[in-house]
């Protein structure tokens, strides 16, 4: 989800939100074609203004188009239509989360691995007429990246968001404090355009990009072990970039409390014999009604059972007078 895109077109934003969540699965080695989605929607208070009602309608249609295009249904979500305070409104928001399963041995990372590795931008294919993702070919690209992550021919992979490929490369390098030398002659769009859902992938220094990935690829540069970033003669260190990246919200979500922590030496706990009373104790019975719109009855029953009670759940059915009476 990119707010700037959603202000321009809630329809396109929702379609690309799905197109961002599925590649994130592919980048860690999980087959996006087998994914399921869940959405989080957040919109301004609608009132009686038709143009406001049009925003969630457009967003949901965009998300539905993407679900049909990729063959990946949304099976859950949560929405809110109260994102207004006085004259302030939230941007039209539909965030997509993709969920899937993969073997631990197949999973990958977004962390750059080795000095000398080559890094490429794999741009998600877009329909030039509609400006929407080319769903069929986009899924082909996602599955090709997933296969590369699983067979380890792709050493690391990340998904492009705000800031473009340049920001993605930097964040991939921050964890290991590796540096990066950008290729000469890259234009601003290649580096900084928010090609949402596109990939940045690392392959070995002596490796060759797979034929299934080559049609989408633009060479971004090579990883260096110096902890410096070089772009058209400009040089910045990893520490400088990390400071700039993290300082934006430092006053809101501080990463440094300014206090030194005291580390206590806690000895290992050794389990001893447990003595259980031979005397019988009362086991209270607990009635837990589950009404329409409520939840957590199973968790509540489990908690009572662990405390020694005998819980009983009754689902209150009220869709007819007879069923309500039976309940």
Regions found by a protein language model. Give the residues of each.
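A glycine-rich phosphate/pyrophosphate-binding beta-strand-loop-alpha-helix module
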Residues: 8-83
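Short hydrophobic/aromatic beta-strand micro-patches
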Residues: 200-204
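Short amphipathic alpha-helical face segments that pack within enzyme cores
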Residues: 16-20, 164, 168, 299
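Aromatic/hydrophobic pocket-lining residues that form π-stacking "cages" and hydrophobic walls in ligand
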Residues: 21, 63, 145, 169, ...
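Short helix-loop-beta junction
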Residues: 174-175, 298-314
């Amino acid at each position: 989800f990119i707010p700037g895109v959603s202000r321009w077109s809630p329809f396109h934003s929702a379609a690309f939100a799905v197109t961002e969540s599925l590649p994130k699965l592919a980048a860690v080695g999980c087959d996006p074609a087998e994914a399921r989605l869940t959405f989080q929607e957040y919109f301004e208070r609608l009132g009686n203004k038709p143009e406001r009602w049009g925003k969630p309608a457009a967003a949901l249609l965009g998300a539905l188009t993407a679900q049909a295009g990729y063959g990946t249904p949304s099976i859950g979500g949560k929405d809110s239509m109260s994102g207004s305070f006085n004259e302030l409104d939230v941007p039209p928001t539909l965030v997509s989360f993709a969920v899937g399963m993969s073997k631990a041995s197949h999973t990958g990372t977004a962390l750059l691995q080795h000095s000398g590795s080559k890094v490429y931008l794999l741009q998600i294919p877009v329909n030039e007429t509609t400006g929407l993702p080319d769903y069929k070919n986009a899924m082909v690209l996602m599955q090709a990246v997933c296969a590369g992550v699983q067979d380890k021919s792709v050493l690391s992979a990340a998904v492009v968001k705000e800031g473009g490929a340049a920001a993605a490369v930097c964040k991939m390098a921050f964890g290991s404090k590796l540096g990066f030398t950008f290729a000469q002659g890259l234009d601003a769009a290649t580096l900084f355009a928010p090609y949402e859902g596109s990939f940045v992938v690392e392959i070995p220094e002596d490796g060759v990009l797979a034929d299934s990935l080559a049609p989408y690829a633009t060479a971004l540069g090579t990883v260096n072990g110096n902890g410096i970033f070089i772009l058209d003669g400009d040089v910045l260190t990893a520490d400088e970039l990390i400071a700039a990246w993290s300082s934006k919200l430092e006053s809101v979500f501080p990463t440094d409390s300014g206090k030194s922590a005291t580390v206590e030496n806690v000895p290992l706990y050794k389990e001893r014999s447990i003595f259980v009373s031979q005397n019988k104790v009362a086991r209270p019975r607990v009635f837990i009604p589950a009404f329409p719109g409520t939840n957590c009855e199973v968790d509540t029953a489990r908690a009572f059972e662990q405390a020694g009670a005998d819980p009983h759940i009754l689902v209150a059915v009220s869709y007819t007078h007879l069923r309500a009476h039976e309940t």
